[in-house]
């Protein structure tokens, strides 16, 4: 048996490794045999591997829910309860920086909402009021880099007309939205994601022409109207979307189980990636490696490896079947 020098060069108390994430590093002297034991148990820190968590809040549809579920991308498995939104609602949009998650808009089940909430992702608890959208609006799309978050499109409460409005907030502050520009096509239940420089908004429902297959993009650090990027293979709404720094992934929709992807830095039509296990609308959040999908009406969570192609596999379960807008502290807009 190898000799064990368990201890810390500063403290006499032993500090044992307990996670694969880099931030869990424990100071001390360990034999190679002990390192192998810790690594086999998933407890030896890996340089460069950061803790990444995802969150799903509210509901996808026009029913009200205030639940916030949290998942761990490193360990995978079932979600845990994080806290509650300030107002119970569905059809909300979400985005995040590396430290703060934001959700806005939606429908309470009886009234439209312009409320924007935020959480500090490292600390479980209920959401806090951030500010307001320019108008009460349901089913906008959300996207962000580490500085700005965008709300794009949605349904106007007064006329039920689809909106082409893009608004933004500075995530590290609080306050009401500011006008950014317009989408090329007015829509609700579109979805958003992107890189640190580009924000994509795609698909969604148009009151006059049904669902849309249009993909738009904007340069997130500036302001102005969106530009056409390309098309999905079919028109649909309620698509789950997320990205790493290179690829944007779109999965499902109201009547399809198709997963498609685009390369964010280019333009063009979407390419087939694989299939999710159900044909349904859903939400998505991502780390640099993994895209995770959840669906209203089901507590099943599925995953794919973003850099490859193929069908989704099981990740775990959420605490409820609500599973509204998804965000994370490791998505492609943050690098």
Indicate residue ranges for each PLM-predicted region.
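Polar, enzyme-active/binding microenvironments
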Residues: 1-335
